[in-house]
Amino acid sequence: MTIKLINIGFGNIVSANRIISIVSPESAPIKRIMQEARDRNMLIDATYGRRTRAVIVTDSDHVILSAVQPETVAQRLHTKEDGVEDA
């Protein structure tokens, strides 16, 4: 099993194999997930103080906040799965 890494913005890298979902932070259930993760010390803020645009949920119950759009993260994940490198 190879480890696939994906850039989630500002030089932050996440293991693509561990990602369960990539969602927008706007809905109340996602905000609740973010708050619960913060309370459990399982929240990773990778936004560098910028607005949260994507919430990444991993199989280890970590919740990662990213400042890039969910579509961008998903596209990077898709290109990594196809074996095509980012330009």
Swiss-Prot record:
Segments crossing the lipid bilayer: none
Pfam families reported in the protein's UniProt record: RemA-like (PF04025)
Taxonomic superkingdom: Bacteria
Family: Belongs to the RemA family.
PANTHER family: REGULATORY PROTEIN SSL2874-RELATED (PTHR38449:SF1), REGULATORY PROTEIN TM_1690-RELATED (PTHR38449)
NCBIfam families reported for this sequence: MtxBflmRegRemA (NF046064), PRK04323.1 (NF003315)
HAMAP family listed in its UniProt record: RemA (MF_01503)
Protein name (database record): Putative regulatory protein ABC2323
